[in-house]
Amino acid sequence: ADPVWKVTSTTTVFNSKVSTDVSYRVPAVAVTKAGTILVFCETRYGTWMDKSGRTDIFMKRSTDKGATWTEKNITEQAVSSKLSYMDPTVVVDQTTGKIFLFTSLWDAVGKPSAQQGYNNRAIMYTSEDDGVTWTRKDLTDEVQIGIYSGFTRMIGSFGPGSGVQMTNEMYKDRLIVPMRSFKVDADKGTVSNGGNTAMYSDDHGVTWQTGQPNKSGEWTVTEAPDGAL
């Protein structure tokens, strides 16, 4: 029989009512190999709107099953920054214990690229100490999609939400991260939705590849008992 989940208590991890200066959007949750709970969220300064200026990715971390939390600003931008880190997406390698956090870096507010996304960067943060410290890497050149169906497809954003580590024997330990693309029409000078795709790694996150895009938008992923996604 399917398990029955019962709500025994609730906890507000991020609360915009505490401060009038920030809004919290787009949460992502993971449980590490050690059982630590990690919750990530966009922290938008001054407004709740998308791509409206400085946006950081904050993390709340609990080692006691959610009773208490510590906070960390993962992206740590300067107060004067107008860049937006958006759509946190997290996946944990339960074999190695390594944690991967992905986020898209959007251009400075006020530039056309800030709305259309054609200068977006694919950023990966990794932690090998259960989420205490993080290392940043720009993956953009490694995972760009390139030409598909006659159009250039560029990094749009990730998930948002969570990735998955496969348990099916054929693809065991494969890490899969949902992502979205933009389609560039050079003749028309336009950038539009290029469909979603997935980024995946078969070497525990050392290298990453992207699949072919299909027609849809934001999405997330889970593995069914038969190994289907």
Where are the regions that the model predicts?
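Asp-box/BNR beta-propeller blade signature and adjacent active/binding-site loops
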Residues: 2-229
